[in-house]
Amino acid sequence: MSELNLMPAVLMRPKAPKLGKRIVLERITFIWKRLSFNQKVTMRNIFRYKKRFFMSIIGIAGCTALIITGFGVKHSVSAVVDKQYHDVLKYDALVRLDDSISTSEAKKYQKNLLQRDAVNNVEYVLNQSIDILKNKEDLYGTLVVYQSMENISNFVNFKDYKTGKKLVLDDDGVILSAKTAELLDVEVNDTMDIELSGTKYNVKISGIMENYFMNYVYMSQNLYESVTAQDLKVNNAFLTMKKMDQSYKTSLEKYMKEKNYGNLSYINNIGEEFDNQVQSVDLVIIILIVCAGALNFIVLYNLTNINIQERKSEIATIKVLGFRRKEVYDYIFRENVILSIIGSLLGTVFGYLLHRFIIRTVELDVTMFVRSLNFTSYIFAIIITLGFTLFIDFVMRRVLNRVNMVESLKSIE
C-alpha cells in the first residue's frame, strides 16, 4: 500500500537495492574474521534477498527429495526378492507331499533324500492356509509348523524386524511376520485369533519377525498339538541343496516322479517370476527419476536467470569497479552453489519422509517393501543436484558476459 503514496515518476524507476544489514554470521566473530572479502559479500547477499533465499532452498530441496524418492523406491522394490528368498527363507526347494504319504513314510523318504548327492538338509513342516482374525475383516495367511527345531536356522531366519536380534521358535507362542503384526496392530506378548479348518484358536505372540511376502504364522509342533489337540501331519518338505546345477536338479526331479513323492518347486524360480513383474515398475521409477532431474534443472535455471536479471545494475557496477570475469562469476554463482548445498541437505530430510509415505501407501496386505533408504540414494541425488548447479552456472556465464555496463547503469535514469 505504500506505493499508492509515491509519485508516478518514482514508481517508474527501478527499486533501489535493499540496504545491507548485519547478519547472524557476523556475530560469530571467529568465523567471520577468517572469511575473505568476496566470501563476506556472498554471505551478505544470500541473507539480503530472503525471498529468493527461501524460494531457492525450497525448490532445490523439493527436487532433491523427488530424486531420492525415485532411487529409494527402486531399491525398496528390487531388494525385496533378495531379502525374502535369501535372507529370510534360506531353503532352496519346496516339495508338496502327496496326500497319501503318512508322517512315518515321510521320515523314510527323508533318509532317501539325504542320500541324494544334491540334497544337504530336509525339514518336514505343516504348511496350511489359515484365516487371521481381526476386527473389521480377516487376513489370509499361512501357518507353518516345524516338526523339528534342531536345524531350523538352515531353513528360515527368525530375526526381529526392529532390532535385528535372533528370535527362537519355542512352545510358548508363535512368531508372526512384521506386516501381519502391523495390520493387526499387535505387539509381542499380545494374543491373536486364527481360524484353522473352520475352528478358531487363540495363540500368544512370542516374536515378530522380518518378512516381506505373505502373512506367515510360525509355530512349533508341541504348541500346535497343544492348541489344536491334534497330531501333526506334515504336508511339505523344505530342502537345502549342496549344488544348484541343472544336472542335479534334473536328477532330483526324476527321483521325485519315480517315487511319486510330490511336486517339487525351486525358490529361485519364484524370485525370478517376481523380478519379471517388477521390471514394469522399474520403467515407471526411471521416468520418475528423469522427470525429477529435469524439474531440478528447470528450477535451478529459472532461479539463476531471475537472479541475474534482477541484479543487472549491481553486476554492471562491480564490472565498472574492476572485477575480473572470474570474480564476477564467483560473485553470482557462489551463492547458487551454497544455496544448492543447503537445499540438497534439506532435501534429504524431505526425501526420507516422502519415500517412507509412498512405500507405506503402495504396500498390499500381503507385501512389505524394504522401507529403509540406502545411502547411495542420498549420494546420487546430491551429486545430480550439484551437477546441474555447476552446469547451469557454466551455461549462464554467457548471460553475465552480455550484461552491458553502460546500458544497465543508464536504465536507472
Model region roles, listed by residue range:
Residues K51-S76, I341:
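Short, strongly hydrophobic transmembrane alpha-helices
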Residues V73, V77-H86, Y248-L295, I306-E310, ...:
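Peri-transmembrane interface segments
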Residues V73-K107, N235-N236, E413:
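Membrane-interface junction motifs in transport/secretion proteins
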Residues V88-L89, V168, I208-M244, N268:
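Small-residue transmembrane helix packing/gating motifs
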Residues D282, N296-I338:
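Interfacial "coupling" helices/loops that link adjacent transmembrane helices in transporter permeases
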